[in-house]
Structures are given as structure tokens and as C-alpha cells.
Amino acid sequence: MKSLAGHVVKYGKHRERRSFARISEVLELPNLIEIQTDSYQWFLDEGLREMFEDILPIDDFNGNLSLEFVDYELKEPKYTVAEARAHDANYSAPLHVTLRLTNRETGEIKAQEVFFGDFPLMTEQGTFIINGAERVIVSQLVRSPGVYFHGKVDKNGKEGFGSTVIPNRGAWLEMETDAKDISYVRIDRTRKIPLTVLVRALGFGSDDTIFEIFGDSETLRNTVEKDLHKNASDSRTEEGLKDVYERLRPGEPKTADSSRNLLNARFFDPKRYDLANVGRYKVNKKLDLKTRLLNLTLAETLVDPETGEIIVEKGTVLTHQVMETLAPFIENGLNSVTYYPSEDGVVTDPMTVQVIKVFSPKDPEREVNVIGNGYPEAPVKTVRPADIIASMSYFLNLMEGIGNVDDIDHLGNRRIRSVGELLQNQFRIGLARMERVVRERMSIQDTETLTPQQLINIRPVVASIKEFFGSSQLSQFMDQTNPLGELTHKRRLSALGPGGLTRDRAGYEVRDVHYSHYGRMCPIETPEGPNIGLINSLSSYAKVNKFGFIETPYRRVDRQTGRVTDQIDYLTADIEDHYIVAQANSPLNEDGTFAQDVVMARAQSENLEVSIDKVDYMDVSPKQVVAVATACIPFLENDDSNRALMGANMQRQAVPLINPQAPWVGTGMEYKSAHDSGAALLCKHDGVVEFVDASQIRVRRDNGALDKYDITKFRRSNSGTSYNQRPIVHLGEKVEKGDTLADGPSMEQGEMALGQNVLSVSMTWEGYNYEDAIIMSRRLVKDDVYTSIHIEEYESEARDTKLGPEEITREIPNVGEDALKDLDEMGIIRIGAEVKDGDLLVGKVTPKGVTELSAEERLLHAIFGEKAREVRDTSLRVPHGGGGIVHDVKIFTREAGDELSPGVNMLVRVYIVQKRKIHEGDKMAGRHGNKGVVSRIMPEEDMPFLPDGTPIDIMLNPLGVPSRMNIGQVLELHLGMAARQLGIHVATPVFDGASDEDVWETVREAGMASEAKTVLYDGRTGEPFDGRVSVGVMYMIKLAHMVDDKLHARSIGPYSLVTQQPLGGKAQFGGQRFGEMEVWALEAYGAAYTLQEILTSKSDDVVGRVKTYEAIVKGEPIPKPGVPESFRVLVKELQSLGLDMRVLDIKDAEIELRDMDDEDDDLITVDALTKFAEQQTAKELEKKAAEQVEDERQDVIQNFETAEDKLD
């Protein structure tokens, strides 16, 4: 029998796959989350100590007291990981620091251990638990400190150059040329000054000294001419100092002294200026004479200063071979020159540089000075005058065609700040704030009784750490949809965040794939949308070195023998640029030599065919180019990169299913990614399994000790999916360290299992799979193939209010006994109860405002105590769409010793679990970016069936393949069918997987037709379809975008306070917005009444909508609408601007716009006051008139009486 395609490989203890890989793995994959764990470990071991030694000792202003750092230790954490989760606490350990306070006057020394706050600890999975939730600190990609040179072209097409010295923290120093070939410097983005001014300020004042140091060049002459000696009373150095000060502090009186202090503080004070180790390394590397002199012609004879021997003659071209003999002499300080700055310069120490004269490539007659910075050691973290002079020399040499400009997007110039460093920077900020406080306290308090404890205020330190974990852009809520999402999140690299880029400013170049990403950052996996290219993923084999640069492993090629050795070198991007690297799939002979004379290789950005004697290194593995999620896509090499990007991103959104299956067609990456994700339960020591059940596994170690492993059951993950582990070991099984004991969510037999292997066919069916829609068999619903479990957490807290404490109780006003049937005697729902939208979970009442009680109420109050008081129902109810089964209830009270936030007496958490079957409207996807929405679930009997009667599970649209160019799915379909027939699992690693021949050979081996197509019968009629069809097994996943979370409808619900219009969005139980364009649509059809009710009764006619509701309930005709509230708001806004706005009818009579509150008679408005005043005036006038009439009447009577008397 012919040998079968592929060979069997074992993944873990429980799974074998037939692998089609041709290249044997030379190097194991590293631990995939070591970027997190190693960095944090470094921080605990070294980073913290570095920080303390940086800030301390702190001296007081007089220099009498000194506070020194002795040591620190982290004590035992207060909570375990599980307890921190349950109590909404932090998983952290108390940090204790031993400090020593020395009084230099009395010689007294006091040492004391000071508590420095709780420090968050990293869990074994590489996460932090902050306030009970798991968070990940994402690594940041930033520009590395160092010295950079760039070319620029001005608007007239003239070429110029620029240079920047970037520190880790401190002032930037920039150099540039202008159109007249004059060189300028800028300090910290201020106005520019001629380059020679800064040189003079450093203490090299005369023109002769400047020409002696830098040599003669046109640019330098132009600059010196521009920089005239204006004030003869100052020396050139003093004048230079004053010029610099004027630019840095415009408007302040300038003196040479203040300028000296300022420049010293800006560049030469280690507290304010820090290049960091990486900056010093990059500066030395860039200014290194060995690389700068390559291929130039010497303009002087170089002599060994010790023996006087000639090393290299004048006129020699400095090739690689010559440089190899010259290198040791250069490193030992060949041609060192010491310059002595003038007494009034910024720096008074002598400056030693190396100067070597060469001929200019542009003008072979002219000599040019190349200045090196004299190799300072690593501890020098500030910039030195020699560095400034050497970088100026490099800058001036660029005009002569010596040296090269830097590519800012090259990964040799970008570095990673991982957790440890980000934390260290944050800690430094806290310590620096604390330092100020300590200094102040030293000067205020009595020195005799002072102790370190009294000096230290830990608040700023604690606050800065808390702020970092709680609100930094890089501290993110962990994506825990499935283990792959979890793993990818920990390996993410972000260019955003503090000190990084912003989305709006990031251009195309920064986001683009760069050749230096090869083997370091994945070219595929990045989000679609505004963050594309700014958020990346670490490649599978990549590591981060001590300087923060990403390294990737290569196999060394022995140049003498031509053998590819198994010796692995990790190279950073800038070192790799010097070598030629062959691809991993270059054919090799048995003895490790190349099988062909010419191989494909990479030299910087070029892909070339190279003869094998020029090759220095070879790739370790074909999958070193891509990230973990991308490496899980079979036949990646047959997919278009845009679709592969979607495939890699969508795998992270797969929902864990009830009984997942590992893919039949895998890539061999499934085991490693599941093992390292943190979701699996791993064995810590070799031993034998002694006990297994659903909640615990016990392993007896070889040395007799017993290890207990608790299994997590149905815990809610960060994304609301179910986090559940299942044992996969048996009693008596021998296990080794690192073996998988229990599967986590989305795992099967220790492998990542995000979805299911389903029988698929590419064919259209009645138009139901138009536009990528998916038709599915009811079997997948019935057999719970795509059923997932979702857990939601709801909480209710009883607080103290001004009117008295809230109470959790069964006795709720206006709630019938039927609604309380599942509540216990405390008023809390029982576990296992089935609840629907709006059902009570926790009964709670809040006291209302106390009104004056009548005599009867007082009597009732005296008899029944509190019960008669007025309370409001504030119970926790199941929100819209949250129904399910109560899975767990947790109760936290003060009495039980739980830590609750201030003012809270009791906290109840209810967990509701939902079992969601697959539905029309759910989103599904394959691994090749082929996504779609389920459009129809059909009975099994209507689905097309195979000749043996097997009904198809899923029908996909064949039109989804050609234009998308993800052919990988077709190959997966065929190979999957063959694997199903043969009953095997296969592995086809990326870029080294099954070839077309392998696929067809396996298809034939499985006894399928040679073109892998088959006759298919219509399930409704039993007739065969016209053509033969591709049927196979595809691995399909159900994504987190489920219709249950998105579908939403509202009849009545909450309204916005000001406009009285319905709220929007599912979360607020809002309505559908009927916007401007929708109004136009109704206007176009003249649908006046429909439009009127949409704008009034259905929206913000407050009175009208209540009356409409009543009318509908009573079955009466709907009343006419009133005035919309938004119109009233408009009127009020205009009135508030002081405009007298009134509403008139057709007859110009004013219409009363009654306010909503006018129903309350006791409310006094401005109109009412005016009316009242008018009424008062009218009453007074009436009274006066009445009095007048009365007076007149009295007069008449009096006259009458007088007349009568006269008659008598």
C-alpha cells in the first residue's frame, strides 16, 4: 500500500493529528504570555528597587537630614484570587519599605519599616484583579529614546536634513537646516538658534575652536557668519549663553549665570533628564565610528598611540576587512582628542571625543572630520557634551553624504513598554510627588523626634498606582469571550496611550506593514476601523529583550561548511538588517546543507534569490511571521490577507458552546494556544491522579505530597459568557508538570475548540442565502450543537438614606402574592427559579418623605411600629431581555464581616443564566473571514441530502468565495470531508500545510470522488440537483453578536426629562427615532394624520399620550393631539433670552399655554402675580368708587335733613 500523505503527531496526552508539515520544528514555541509575566517579575525583582534608588535619598533644604532607602518586601496578599473576585476587591499584597533617616548634625540614625500601600499582584494567567474584575495591561509601542536623523525637502525642492535627540524624559534637542544652508538648533520645541550659539554656550567660544572641532564645511561657515558677535563686553561664550536663555525664557532678564543653571538642569541633571539604558545604547550605536566610517576614504594615516605602528595608511578605503582590523583600536580610544571648555561655559570638565579625518564623497579633495562620542559606559543616563558634539558632527556629515537617515517606523527604532515599565513610570510619578511632601515635612517638623513614618505620606503613591490600574488607556477590561481572545489580549501591542500616538494624528506610514515586522509583529491581525495598524499582535515566536526591542529567533548558518545549524540566535530588527536570512521552507539535505544552489532570502526590505554561500541565517519556522490567532487558520496561504484579518479577529469573538469540538482540520496551534491561555487547569508537579470529580482533582506527587486543584464551574466571565472547566484526566492516570488536567471554556481534550465541525455545502437555495446569509438544519438547534450559556449579574444594595435605611424585605407595597412566590422570607429570589422580564429578584423598599400624621395614623404607628411609615418600592427586577434561571445568589452584609462601600448595609448579587440556542439573526463565521447571518432554520427533512441519506447541516452561498479570494475555505471543505470519512484529525500548519496534491491524495484515500464533489438530492422532492456539488466539513463558529442582544421593541417606556421625548437605545428601553428624513418620507406621501400622531401622541405631547392610552384601554376614539412639549421648550428658551414670545390663534387671540405644573393651584407663576396685581388695583378702584358714591349719598341725605329742619 502506498504511504499515506502526512505523518502522525501527538498534541498533549489526549489528541493525535495527521500533520502535513514538511519542516521539522527546531524550536519549541515560547510560553505565549511571558511578555506579561516576565515583565512583571522584572518589576518586582529590579524595577521597584531602581525606582527607590532613583528618588531616594531625599535631603532637606539645609542638608542636615537625609532619608535613605534600605530594602523593601511584599508581604502575604490579603485575599486569594477567588476571594478578591467574590468580594469586588483587589488581588494585592502590602508593600513594606525599610527606610533610614540620618541626622547629619547629631549623627543619629533611625531605621523603620514603612507601609507603602497595597500593590496589585499579577495572577499566574498574566492578569490583574482590580475591584473584582480581571484586567490586562496592554504593552505599548513607542519611539525609542536615542538620536535620529531625517531628510526633508523644502517647497523649492532643496534637500535638507534634521536631527532629534529624544530622551526617555526631559527636553528634546533638535537640529535642522534652512534654505540658505544655515544650521539651527531648537531646545524643547522653542524658537531656533544658530547651531554655533549652542556650541559656544557649552564653552567652545571662538570661531577657530569650532572649525578645529568640526572641520571646515560650507554649512558651518554660513552658520558662523550668521552668528555675529553683537556685544563686545561679553565673551563669545557668555553671549551664546544669553542667546540660549532668551529663547528658552523669553521676556525674562537674561544673565549668563541663570542660563548656565537652566542648561545644566535641562540636559545634565539626572533627575530631570534621563536617556535610560536603552537611550544610551541607541545613542552609542548611532554615533559609533565603526559603522559611520564604513566605505569612506581615509584622509590621514592612523597610528597606534602605544607602539607608534601605522595601522592604516592615508587614502585607504575602509572596507569591511579594513574595519575589522581597525575596530579594536577605535574601541580603545584611537585618535582621542580632549578639548578644554572655557571657564564660563555650561560644562567645565574636559571633553574627550574621537576625531578621524576622511575625504568627502561629494568632493574627494576636501577633508571632513568624523567625530565619535568616545563610548561612555551604560550608567551615564544623561546626555554629555561629547554626545551633543558628535551628533552635530553626524548632522553636518549628512550634507557631505556621510552617514544615513533613520526610518522612524523601523522596529529597531520602536520599542515595547510592557507592564513592568509602565508600572515603574507610574510609581516614579507617585514617588516624585511624595518627595515634595517629605522635603516640606523635614523643614517644618522637630528634627529630634522625627521618624521616617512621620515624614512619609503614601497617599500620592497609592493614588498614582490606583489611577493607573483604574483609568489608564492601557489598563483594559480583559476580553474574556473565549480563551483565544484572552490570550490575544495579553499579547496585544498598542501604539496609543500616554506618550504614544493618537488616532487622528497617526498617518498611513505608521499604520502600514513594515519589512522589520517580519517575525516580530503580525502583519495580519489588527482591528478594522480607526485603530487599524495602531494596535498589533506579537508574532508567535517573538520575545522582548531587556531594552524593550522585539527579537525573533533564527537558525545560524555556518558559513565555512554551509550547514544550517540548530543554534538559535534572537535578533532585533536593526541587527537583522546586517544579515541575509533564508526562508524556513528552503529545502535542506540530510546533513543540514541547502539542497539548492540558490535560495529565496530577505535582505532588509528586498526579497531576493541568493547563492547559498551568502546566507547568514534561516527562519526557525514558517509560522514565526504570524500571531497566535492567525496561526490557527488552516490554509492561510490560500486566503487573501484582508479576509484572513477578519478570520483572525472573528475567532476571538467565538462564544463558548456547551459541547465544543476541536476542528478536524486544524493547524497544530490549537493545543499550545489553549494550554497557554490561562483557561485550562494545568498540572504543577509530576504525579498520579488520586481523585477526580466535577469540582476537584487531587494529584499525589512523586514525593508523597498531595496537590489539590479546584475546578471552576459556571462562573460568569468578563463578557457574560460561561466560564466552565471539565476534567479530562482519569483516576490513576500518570501526569507530568504542565499537562492539562481540565479543559476550560471552548476547549476539548486540551485543544482550542471555538466552534463545531458541520457538514456544509456551497449552493444557493431559494434565495435564502443571498448576501452571505446562512441556511441551517434544525438538527443543530435540536441537538444543541450551537447552544451557548450566558450568565448575567444583577445587584441591589440597601443603603442608608437621609430618611432612614433602605430595607430588603418581602413586604412590598402594591405587589400581589403571585409576584412574590419565588422570594424567600428575606425577599430574595430562590436559586433555580425561572424568571421572566420584569419579575422581582430582590424586594427592597426605600423610605419616602415623612408627612404630618393624623391621629389614627399615629395610633397605627404606635401599635405596628415602622410598618405604617410611607415607603417606596425600589426592588430589583429582571431587565428587558434578561429572563432565565437563577443560578446563584450572593449576599454580603456588614455583620458577616464583608467589606462594603460606605453607606451600604447589605449587598445582594443575583446571577441569571440563559441557555441560548442558535437563532435566525445570529452571526456565524468560518476561520477564513467568511461570515454571515443565519437567515433560515429548516426542518431536517427539507435539507438536501447525500446519496447515503445524510442531511446537510449548513448551506453557504458559493458567490461568497470568488470575489473574496479566500480559497482556503474550499480546501478546508474537501480535507474536512476526507478527515470525516477517515475518522482522523489533521493538522495543516500555516505556510507549511497540505499542498493541493496532499489534499487530493487524502480525498482519494477516503474513497471520495476524484474531484471531491457529489450528487445531492433535494430534501423536499427527493430529486437529485442538476450538477455535482462540493460537500464537505467546515469548522463554523457562533459569534458573540447574537440577535437576542440586539433585537428590541417598545410600546411604552421612559421619557427624557427636558424634551419629554422617548429615550433611545436598547439599554434605556428606548424608542425608534423618527428623524428628519423619515418625516420627509411621510410628507412626500401626504400622510398627515400618521405624521401628526408620530410627532405628538407617540412622542412628546404629555397630556395627549396619557389620554390616548386611556382611550385605547377603554376602546374609545383617540382624542385630538395637543401641543408637543418640545414646542414649549422652544418658547421657554426664547423667553429666557428676553424675547416676549406668545402663541396666537387665527383671530390673533392669545392661546394660553398651560404649563404641566399649572395643575397645582398653589404654584405661583409670573403671569399669576401680574393677574393678582391687576385684580388688587381693580378692587381698590371699586372700593374708591363705592366710597365716593357713599359720600355723595351721605351729602344728599344731609342736605335733605337740613332742608327739613328749615321747613319745621
Swiss-Prot record:
Question: What processes does the entry annotate via GO biological process terms?
Answer: DNA-templated transcription
Supply the alphabetized keyword list.
DNA-directed RNA polymerase, Nucleotidyltransferase, Transcription, Transferase
Which GO terms of the cellular component aspect does the record hold? DNA-directed RNA polymerase complex
E.C. designation(s): 2.7.7.6
- InterPro entries the record matches: DNA-dir_RNA_pol_bsu_ext_1_sf, DNA-dir_RNA_pol_bsu_external_1, DNA-dir_RNA_pol_su2, DNA-dir_RNAP_su2_dom, DNA-dir_RNAP_su2_hyb_sf, RNA_pol_bsu_bac, RNA_pol_bsu_CS, RNA_pol_bsu_protrusion
Q: What class of enzyme is it?
A: transferase
**Recorded catalytic activity of this chain's protein:** RNA(n) + a ribonucleoside 5'-triphosphate = RNA(n+1) + diphosphate
**NCBIfam families annotated for this entry?**
PRK00405.1, rpoB
* Protein name as it appears in the record: DNA-directed RNA polymerase subunit beta
